UniProtKB/Swiss-Prot annotation:
Binding annotation for Zn(2+): C46, C239, H264
Subunit structure: Monomer.
HAMAP family listed in its UniProt record: MshC (MF_01697)
UniProt gene name: mshC
Keyword rRNA-binding applies: no
Record text on cofactor binding: Binds 1 zinc ion per subunit.
Family per similarity comment: Belongs to the class-I aminoacyl-tRNA synthetase family. MshC subfamily.
Chain ranges for the short sequence motif 'KMSKS' region as given in the UniProt record: 297-301
PANTHER family: CYSTEINE--TRNA LIGASE, CYTOPLASMIC (PTHR10890:SF3), CYSTEINYL-TRNA SYNTHETASE (PTHR10890)
Protein name as catalogued: L-cysteine:1D-myo-inositol 2-amino-2-deoxy-alpha-D-glucopyranoside ligase
Amino acid sequence: MLAWSSPDVPSLDDPGECPREVRVRDTATGELTPAGHDGRASMYVCGITPYDSTHLGHANTYVSFDLLVRAWRDAGLAVTYVQNVTDVDDPLLERAAATGVDWRQLAADQIELFHHDMVALRVVAPEHYIGAVESVPDVVRAVERMLADRAAYRVGAAADGAGDGDVYAALSADPRFGSLGSLDEAEMLELFGERGGDPDRLGKQAPLDPLLWRVEREEEPSWPGESLGRGRPGWHIECATIAARFLGVPFDVQGGGTDLEFPHHEMSESHLRVLTATAHPARAHVHGGMVAYQGHKMSKSRGNLVFVSELVASGVDPMAVRLVILAHHYAEDWEYEAGALGLAEERLATWRAALAQGSGPSGADVVAGVRAALANDLDAPGAVAVVDDWAAAAIAGSGDDAAAGATVARAVDALLGVAL
């Protein structure tokens, strides 16, 4: 699957003065850890299920991890970034049935909209953008291996009579399961049931065991599964197989929102451990905060969504939307309010007015300050404050660096993704 077109990202001068290490907070340990090794960096970020794209919660995730890609590249690392798109899954099929739109067309339309939004927000595209459908052969091979190793098993029909032969992972095969978070079994079961799991499925060896292969049902899409029979993949195994194929293990960062920490990342990590015999397939798990609106986390089920495309269509500069996001640390939960957009538009106008002054305080100091902020757990608010301070001083007539405006514009573009 083709990703969107990446923006042109300018190179900055004096790369030797750039921090050579970007540190992020690992969910598993709670500690800051270097991200990137031996001149290379690799990251997997979970992508959209394309049936309602792109709201500010999505944008928050992808803009946040875009900062990491930009910081890595500025530091001279060779970056491999992989993102999936879950282009077949129960929520997509349910939305298609409810609207009378073919599920393939719905997915294609929403993926195209997502791409337009990523282009508008100047998010750097991943090197590999992989759909669940195209990963089916890899999933089949992985599930067959797990069955052969007794790390998976088949179950009989569900209570509705369907699903005879569904394949589930035996989490008992992974002694490290649960090591990513700090949840007890009751908390895991509650979240598993809320987030797509089926703890009460008859025939399972344990309530938390996740689906690997859903055998063919009437009026559902399916694909050849070799010895598994026709069907479609489970959610967690899709990401595990895509990461294994396009990144290998271990890779540096597994990224996504905090709502993916459990069960999705915990279970994908478990599958990778079983398939690769690697204790820590991802060196660090990095999770972004949730965005709320009208008092609740933005969610498709609640319908309290603010769409990037609608903001842009109303005349909002996409760079102001990006600045709304950059005003918050990626790990922060925050609530969107209309006033935030006005503040972001004012900030954008101030930065542009500062560039028009012709000279100002040292641009090199801005580059160093923004780099230092991003190297410290992607501190976007700290980086934005550096630019705010420079802009205020430039407008006040301080400084005589004639090249400052051009230097700052390149830095803000390259590191923060904001085109001035």
